[in-house]
């Protein structure tokens, strides 16, 4: 087998791909500039056939929600996947297009858009069931013997350092004890938060800002977009970054470089 090579992986919640296509720079402009080996997106808000994206040199993998204009994920990869999985065994959310799991020759790549717990945590039970099923799904992929890289919008700020105003957000969606604990269980199951592993004390590093109240201008944000790797690949990570200068969505892209 050929020697491993450094891969550049990018994840971005675009909050509606059609909207980002119309912005300057457009999605394709950002995509071309970042020049990733694998580019994952979440919250495409598309139905099949609504757009035809021209990305020469990339294989396109899509997962659409049954409900129109909602959720959805996609992965654009230079390497052709050996297989693609689009469900994880979470009945209440498996029809929402939330996962694209691609098996490549050397590793698994899993793009995820985790269900939001919603105001008053009214969808928390669905969220907890999803987290448990996703954790079991990832552990199952690790058992195949290949390293696992998973990325996307996990809809949780894990620790107080991961959001600007933890004191006023305790118990809110994305910062409830249940969601934070569940994310901790995923790490305990053998996954590493790559950004925090490389930047353990870096405050003010966020990937999502509310559209309200000039939150992005004042950097009143949350870090809810992650790249996690299975423990067997942690020492292969060469870089982890948040690309906060990239506009077009209420999220910015996050990036991982890794030798696989």
Regions flagged by a language model, labelled:
Residues 7-17, 106-118, 151:
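Active-site-proximal beta-strand elements of phosphoester/diester hydrolases
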Residues 45, 50-119:
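Structured beta-strand-rich core segments of catalytic domains in phosphoester-bond hydrolases
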Residues 241-260:
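Surface polyanion/phosphate-binding segment centered on an Asp-His-Pro turn
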Residues 1-55, 65, 70, 158:
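N-terminal, active-site-proximal structural segment of metallo-dependent hydrolase catalytic domains
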Residues 89-90, 115-131, 167-172:
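Surface-exposed cleft-lining segments at the edges of enzyme active sites
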Residues 15, 45, 113-115, 155-157, ...:
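Catalytic metal-binding/acid-base residues of hydrolase active sites
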Residues 132-220, 224:
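Metal-dependent phosphoesterases centered on the DNase I-like endonuclease/exonuclease/phosphatase
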Residues 68-84, 212-235:
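Conserved beta strand-loop-helix elements of the APE1-like EEP
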């Amino acid at each position: 087998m050929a020697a491993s090579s450094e891969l550049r992986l990018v994840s971005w919640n675009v909050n509606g791909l059609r909207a980002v296509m119309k912005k300057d720079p457009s999605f394709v402009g950002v995509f071309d500039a970042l020049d990733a080996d694998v580019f994952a997106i979440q919250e495409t808000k598309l139905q099949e056939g609504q757009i035809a994206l021209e990305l020469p040199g990339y294989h396109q993998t899509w997962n659409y929600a049954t409900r129109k204009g909602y959720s959805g994920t996609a992965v654009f990869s230079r390497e052709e996947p050996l297989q693609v999985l689009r469900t994880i065994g979470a009945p209440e959310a498996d029809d929402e297009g939330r996962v694209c799991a691609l098996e490549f020759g050397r590793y698994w790549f899993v793009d995820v858009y985790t269900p939001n717990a919603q105001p008053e945590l009214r969808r928390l039970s669905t969220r907890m069931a999803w987290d448990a099923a996703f954790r079991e799904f990832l552990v199952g992929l690790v058992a195949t013997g290949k390293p696992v890289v998973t990325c996307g919008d996990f809809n949780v700020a894990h620790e107080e350092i991961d959001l600007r105003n933890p004191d006023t957000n305790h118990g809110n969606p994305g910062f409830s004890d249940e969601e934070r604990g569940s994310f901790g269980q995923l790490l305990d199951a053998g996954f590493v938060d790559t950004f925090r592993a490389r930047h353990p004390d870096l405050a003010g590093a966020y990937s999502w800002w509310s559209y309200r109240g000039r939150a992005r201008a004042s950097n009143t944000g949350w870090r809810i977009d992650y790249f996690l790797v299975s423990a067997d690949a942690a020492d292969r990570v060469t870089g982890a970054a948040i690309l906060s200068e990239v506009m077009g969505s209420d999220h910015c892209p996050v990036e991982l470089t890794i030798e696989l």
